[in-house]
């Protein structure tokens, strides 16, 4: 099996200092604010050029406090949305316990100050490593016909 390595491009400074205080989805806490600080060479203003025209971002991050052990495999998880008692397949959930500890959140871009992104509506723990950022594209990212009977 192939192994890949990712560069951490920055870190989140968040209002959430403990993982148990974080909302389950970012849209549940629109007032929750944070800031993304970039590491070199991504702290160059050229890396964020054009974001001033964007209202929302996709944040790819690492669940750094739920890193799986080398030989750990979780095929089923207990999502809080189902009361924490019913198990479903890991790929049918948004559990932090994943084969690879990668997370994805959509956040509101409130502004850019001194090369840092001011973000709101977050569900990210303070100190969360960021591996990528992409602009939210409404016509491609919002799927009105999507169905999820679990959520």
Protein language model features and the residues they cover:
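Glycine-rich, low-complexity intrinsically disordered segments
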Residues: 1-106, 110-151
